[in-house]
Amino acid sequence: MKTVTEFQNKNILVLGIAKSGYAAATLLQKLGANVIVNDGKPLAENVLAAELQAKGMDVVCGGHPLELLERNISLVVKNPGIPYSNPILVAAKEKQIPIVTEVELAYRISEAPFVGITGSNGKTTTTMLTFEMLKEGQKHPVIAGNIGTVACEVAQDAKENEVVVTELSSFQLMGVELFQPKIAAFLNLFEAHLDYHGTKKEYGLAKANIFKNQTENDYSVINADDADVMALSAYSKGQKILFSTTKEIEDGACIKDNALYFKGEKVIEVSDIVLPGQHNLENILAAMSIAKLLGTSNEAITVVLKRFTGVKHRLEYVTTINNRKFYNDSKATNMLATEKALSAFTQPIVLLAGGLDRGNEFDDLIPYFKNVKAIVTFGQTAPKLVRAAEKAGLDIIESVDTLDEAVVKAYAHSKDGDVVLLSPACASWDQFKTFEERGDIFIQAVHKLI
């Protein structure tokens, strides 16, 4: 860990606990800050807050009182999930108090360089692929962020010869000041999180913060097939490395003659890759680009791509029952992810979809329903998905209250050779704590059918 003195004896407000807030508060105390921790959940229900209080921190729970800002606060470290429209953040901004997220702290203390990966979809798969390729190539990666350990915990122990690989959301990237990844990858942009950002433009600009501090000594890995990403790459001063599944890229990554190439050199045949789905070729090209930029051999990349079958809750194969294959794609929290999941199969599909209503309709899914023989909807968006399915002319359309019911109905509508696919196209928070919980409940319900 770098020797950092900028936080010593400063009053720093950690807003929102959870894993990242807990780690940030603990780190800041270690760095000599006077830490004030604030969380909306009452202290009596807040185990993490009680632990921080026992460490000697000033803990205020049950709301976000504006009076906290009267304590000569030098910095606010916010939980990514707390919107900037929250009154305490609005007031902090008016007082010109810097507001950052935990990943910014991680960067400031880390001896190791960062690889940052963002995009609307594919972040986790690309992050895991990158980690595995670098590990196989003996480049000493450590993984941090939404998968793995919280970034500022990893950064404390990361050495100069290692590399921190982290998945970054728009929420996290809105709170960066000095964060400068050696390699920044921007995979794609799709209209999402409008309840948080307001517009797709603002959402895209938040994502583009990944390029904010890059220089000509850094690299920006860009999806050449995504017009929005290409436009936002103008914010990068780094060396641009493009990847594409549709056109030949001489100085980047592409698919040519059914093989993956990087800077004109063949790396692997597409037929040797075990990870399913056309969309995953984009993720693979991005990960391969990062790995090659860090000196990983073609042999190491090939070894990984011949064994990597995917990440849990991302088009995860569950089991086969009476020749029906069940797949868990609970991480599909927006339409683009579900479109890509539906495009991954040629067999008839029984689709389970639904979840949190963020105000959008689902007509964009209609062209992807060509292999969908039946849909079972659940959650807040069930009526909207039913409308889209009716417009698509699906014969079998059902709505149920719970995911358990949806699994039973989906199985009843399936036949020999079908795929039963959970790909909700929505966030999970209307009925579940996380998409992981939703996926686990789906898997449990499937196994009950056996």
Swiss-Prot record:
HAMAP family: MurD (MF_00639). SUPFAM superfamilies: MurCD N-terminal domain (SSF51984), MurD-like peptide ligases, catalytic domain (SSF53623), MurD-like peptide ligases, peptide-binding domain (SSF53244). This is UDP-N-acetylmuramoylalanine--D-glutamate ligase. The gene is murD. Its EC number is 6.3.2.9. Pfam families: Mur_ligase_C, Mur_ligase_M, MurD-like_N. Keywords: ATP-binding, Cell cycle, Cell division, Cell shape, Cell wall biogenesis/degradation, Cytoplasm, Ligase, Nucleotide-binding, Peptidoglycan synthesis. It is found in: Cytoplasm. GO terms for molecular function: ATP binding; UDP-N-acetylmuramoylalanine-D-glutamate ligase activity.
